[in-house]
């Protein structure tokens, strides 16, 4: 078996499942967490972890991209909870997906239409 195949060359370098999938998020760790959380005695398909990692990575990249743009608009180099809040609430799809309250996120600027007076009438009073 193994001895015949391996003889003459060194053992192959280990390649992580994240690297195989071309992801930054840890596929192995996500797989372990999925196994720990399931009721069916830790039976989780191999591709389930890869797919989950890809989804989490995409969503994280999306939020960070928008938050980075928000911080750039305000001419600062550091992303704060405020920038995350502005990014998430500014995007319709992310807003519907992430309904959690962001600590230190502040509020979204909004003035109701009826409260904004007309330019002409404001000068008269």
Curated annotation (Swiss-Prot):
One of its GO terms (cellular component) is nucleosome. There is a cross-link at residue 119 (Glycyl lysine isopeptide (Lys-Gly) (interchain with G-Cter in ubiquitin)). Keywords: Acetylation, Chromosome, DNA-binding, Isopeptide bond, Nucleosome core, Nucleus, Ubl conjugation. Pfam families: Histone, Histone_H2A_C. InterPro entries: Histone-fold (IPR009072), Histone_H2A (IPR002119), Histone_H2A/H2B/H3 (IPR007125), Histone_H2A_C (IPR032454), Histone_H2A_CS (IPR032458). GO terms for biological process: heterochromatin formation. Monoubiquitination of Lys-119 gives a specific tag for epigenetic transcriptional repression. May be acetylated. The keyword Nucleus applies. SMART domains: H2A. Variant histone H2A which replaces conventional H2A in a subset of nucleosomes. Nucleosomes wrap and compact DNA into chromatin, limiting DNA accessibility to the cellular machineries which require DNA as a template. Histones thereby play a central role in transcription regulation, DNA repair, DNA replication and chromosomal stability. DNA accessibility is regulated via a complex set of post-translational modifications of histones, also called histone code, and nucleosome remodeling. May be involved in the formation of constitutive heterochromatin. The nucleosome is a histone octamer containing two molecules each of H2A, H2B, H3 and H4 assembled in one H3-H4 heterotetramer and two H2A-H2B heterodimers. The octamer wraps approximately 147 bp of DNA. H2A or its variant H2AF/Z forms a heterodimer with H2B. This is Histone H2A.V.
């Amino acid at each position: 078996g193994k001895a015949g195949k391996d003889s003459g060359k060194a053992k192959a370098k280990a390649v992580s499942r994240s690297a195989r999938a071309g992801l930054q998020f840890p596929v192995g760790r996500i797989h372990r967490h999925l196994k720990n959380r399931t009721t069916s005695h830790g039976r989780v398909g191999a591709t389930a972890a890869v797919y989950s990692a890809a989804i989490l990575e995409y969503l994280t990249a999306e939020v960070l991209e928008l938050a980075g743009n928000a911080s750039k608009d305000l001419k600062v180099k550091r992303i704060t909870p405020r920038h995350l809040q502005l990014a998430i609430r500014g995007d319709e799809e992310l807003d519907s997906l992430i309904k959690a309250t962001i600590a230190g996120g502040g509020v979204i600027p909004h003035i109701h239409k009826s409260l904004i007076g007309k330019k002409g009438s404001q000068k008269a009073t």
